[in-house]
C-alpha cells in the first residue's frame, strides 16, 4: 500500500479548466486501479495558504535551531509543518496546475515555499545543497493554452520548468508529465487536444 498525495492548484470549474479535467480523470482512474492505497487530496485554493514571509521564516528558523517560539510563531511553524510532514510522508505525489501568465498559480508557489525547508526536503553540505526526497514518485498534470514546448514561446515557459526545478533541488528524479497545450491557440483542435491529454492522464494513473 502506498501513501499518495494529490495536489490541485486550480479553482476554476472543471468545464472551464483543462488541468482540472486532467486531475479528475487521473484521480478517478487511480482510485479504481489502486483501491488499497491511502490517498489524500489537497485543494490549495481551499486551503487558503498565507504567503510565506518573515513571520514564517523566523518561526521555522527558531524551531530548527531549538529556540523557544512565541505562541504566534508556534502557530505559524505548525502550519508549515502540517503541509511539510504530509508531503514527506507520501510515497507518490501528483500535482495538477495550469500555466497562468507563464508560471504557476501563486498558491502553488506558496505551497512549494512551505516545503523548501533545509534539513527536511534538502540539506546543506560543504559541496553544496543535496536533495532528500529522492525516493518519491511524482506526476505533473498541467495545461497551457498556447504552445510552449517548442518555438519562440518555449523560453517563456516557467510553470512546469519551475516545478521540475524545485523537485530536482529536493532530489526528486522520478517525474512523469502529462501536458495539454495549444487548445486555446488552435480552437478547431481544442476538443481533440484535451481528449488526448485526458486519455494520457488515465493511462498514467493506471500505471503510476
From Swiss-Prot:
E.C. numbers: 1.6.5.-, 1.7.1.17
Chain ranges passing through the membrane: none
Signal sequence, start to end: none
Molecular function terms, GO-annotated: electron transfer activity; FMN binding; oxidoreductase activity, acting on NAD(P)H as acceptor; oxidoreductase activity, acting on NAD(P)H, quinone or similar compound as acceptor
Residues given in the record as FMN binding sites: 99-102
Keyword annotations of the record: Flavoprotein, FMN, NAD, Oxidoreductase
Pfam families on file: Flavodoxin_2
Keyword Oxidoreductase: yes
Record-linked InterPro entries: Flavodoxin_fold, Flavoprotein-like_sf, FMN-dep_NADH:Q_OxRdtase_AzoR1, NADH:quinone_OxRdtase_FMN_depd
Domain of life (superkingdom): Bacteria
Keyword Oxidoreductase: yes
Needed co-factor(s): FMN
Catalytic activity: 2 a quinone + NADH + H(+) = 2 a 1,4-benzosemiquinone + NAD(+); N,N-dimethyl-1,4-phenylenediamine + anthranilate + 2 NAD(+) = 2-(4-dimethylaminophenyl)diazenylbenzoate + 2 NADH + 2 H(+)
Details of cofactor binding: Binds 1 FMN per subunit.
Family that this chain belongs to: Belongs to the azoreductase type 1 family.
Cited function: Quinone reductase that provides resistance to thiol-specific stress caused by electrophilic quinones. Also exhibits azoreductase activity. Catalyzes the reductive cleavage of the azo bond in aromatic azo compounds to the corresponding amines.
Subunit and partners: Homodimer.
Name recorded for this polypeptide: FMN-dependent NADH:quinone oxidoreductase
Amino acid at each position: 500500500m502506498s501513501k499518495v498525495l494529490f495536489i490541485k492548484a486550480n479553482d476554476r470549474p472543471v468545464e472551464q479548466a483543462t488541468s482540472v479535467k486532467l486531475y479528475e480523470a487521473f484521480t478517478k482512474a487511480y482510485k479504481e486501479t489502486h483501491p488499497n492505497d491511502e490517498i489524500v487530496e489537497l485543494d490549495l485554493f481551499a486551503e487558503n495558504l498565507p504567503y510565506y514571509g518573515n513571520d514564517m521564516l523566523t518561526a521555522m528558523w527558531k524551531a530548527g535551531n531549538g529556540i523557544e517560539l512565541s505562541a504566534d510563531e508556534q502557530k505559524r511553524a505548525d502550519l508549515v509543518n502540517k503541509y511539510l510532514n504530509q508531503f514527506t510522508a507520501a510515497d507518490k505525489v501528483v500535482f495538477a496546475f495550469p500555466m497562468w501568465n507563464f508560471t504557476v498559480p501563486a498558491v502553488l508557489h506558496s505551497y512549494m515555499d512551505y516545503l523548501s525547508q533545509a534539513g527536511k526536503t534538502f540539506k546543506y553540505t560543504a559541496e553544496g545543497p543535496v536533495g532528500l526526497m529522492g525516493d518519491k514518485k511524482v506526476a505533473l498534470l498541467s495545461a497551457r493554452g498556447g504552445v510552449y514546448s517548442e518555438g519562440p514561446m518555449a523560453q517563456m515557459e516557467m510553470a512546469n520548468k519551475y516545478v521540475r526545478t524545485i523537485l530536482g533541488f529536493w532530489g526528486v528524479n522520478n517525474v512523469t508529465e502529462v501536458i495539454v497545450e495549444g487548445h486555446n491557440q488552435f480552437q478547431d483542435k481544442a476538443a481533440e487536444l484535451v481528449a488526448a491529454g485526458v486519455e494520457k492522464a488515465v493511462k498514467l494513473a493506471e500505471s503510476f
